[in-house]
Amino acid sequence: MSLSIDVTSLPSISSSIFKNESSSTTSTLSGKSIGRSEQYISPDAEAFNKYMLSKSPEDIGPSDSASNDPLTSFSIRSNAVKTNADAGVSMDSSTQSRPSSNVGCDQVDFSLTKGINVSANLDSCISISTDHKKEKSKKDKSRKHYPRIEADSDSEDYVLDDSDSDDGKCKNCKYKKKYFALRMRMKQVAMQLIEDL
């Protein structure tokens, strides 16, 4: 797993990553030991250009400036003037060269030594228990206990009162006895169903 971070806007971080311990007075470039005063500190821009043109393209590394922009060369020389050679601060003696593939973009690769193990085992148990059939059979059994209603035909005419009828609609009921028996049985069935539920 690698993490790439753009540190172009952070020059202090990028310079500290590629900087190693260096010599206090000299800088090693292409096998030659050149003093810092001879390399960078030059009051004349032509001397700096001559120095860059005198080097072969193979010897020019990331620590050198191959730009012909006067502002770039001036900033390099001004930073070099501020650098004290006797203090042991060297900006170009790093044994670890900067990556030249990504121009203008410093990349830092962080390699994680510890692997991240993600356990994605989902132990899920779904148990669905339905008692629908049992309830059905129970209802069937309870219904079997109910006695059947057998109606006897009556030839007599029965007249219901208004209290027994629905809004007085049933004035002449021929089967009053059968009606009362049916109503009683329905009440018993309803009460039995309520108790079962």
Curated annotation (Swiss-Prot):
Alphabetized GO MF terms: ATP hydrolysis activity; magnesium ion binding; nucleotide binding; RNA binding
Binding positions (Mg(2+)): 92
Keywords tagged on the record: Glycoprotein, Host cytoplasm, Magnesium, Metal-binding, Nucleotide-binding, Phosphoprotein, RNA-binding
Post-translational modification: O-glycosylated. Hyperphosphorylated on serine residues, when in dimeric form. Phosphorylation by host CK1 is required for the hyperphosphorylation of NSP5 dimer.
Pfam family, one: Rota_NS26
Cofactor binding notes: Magnesium is required for ATPase activity.
Residue positions where Phosphoserine is found in the record: 67, 153, 155, 163, 165
Residue span of region Homodimerization and interaction with NSP6: 188-197
Region (Disordered): 17-37, 53-72, 129-166
GO cellular component, one term: host cell cytoplasm
Compartments, record wording: Host cytoplasm
Keyword Flavoprotein: no
Disulfide bonds: none
Metal-binding is among the record's keywords: yes
Biased composition (Acidic residues): 152-165
Cofactors required: Mg(2+)
Subunit composition and interactions: Homodimer. Interacts with VP1. Interacts with VP2. Interacts with NSP2; this interaction leads to up-regulation of NSP5 hyperphosphorylation and formation of virus factories. Interacts with NSP6. Participates in the selective exclusion of host proteins from stress granules (SG) and P bodies (PB). Also participates in the sequestration of these remodeled organelles in viral factories.
Similarity comment text for this entry: Belongs to the rotavirus NSP5 family.
Biological function: Plays an essential role in the viral genome replication. Participates, together with NSP2, in the formation of viral factories (viroplasms), which are large inclusions in the host cytoplasm where replication intermediates are assembled and viral RNA replication takes place. Orchestrates the recruitment of viroplasmic proteins such as capsid proteins to these factories. Participates in the selective exclusion of host proteins from stress granules (SG) and P bodies (PB). Also participates in the sequestration of these remodeled organelles in viral factories.
Name of the protein in question: Non-structural protein 5
Source organism of this protein record: Rotavirus A (strain RVA/Pig/Mexico/YM/1983/G11P9[7])
Lineage: Viruses, Riboviria, Orthornavirae, Duplornaviricota, Resentoviricetes
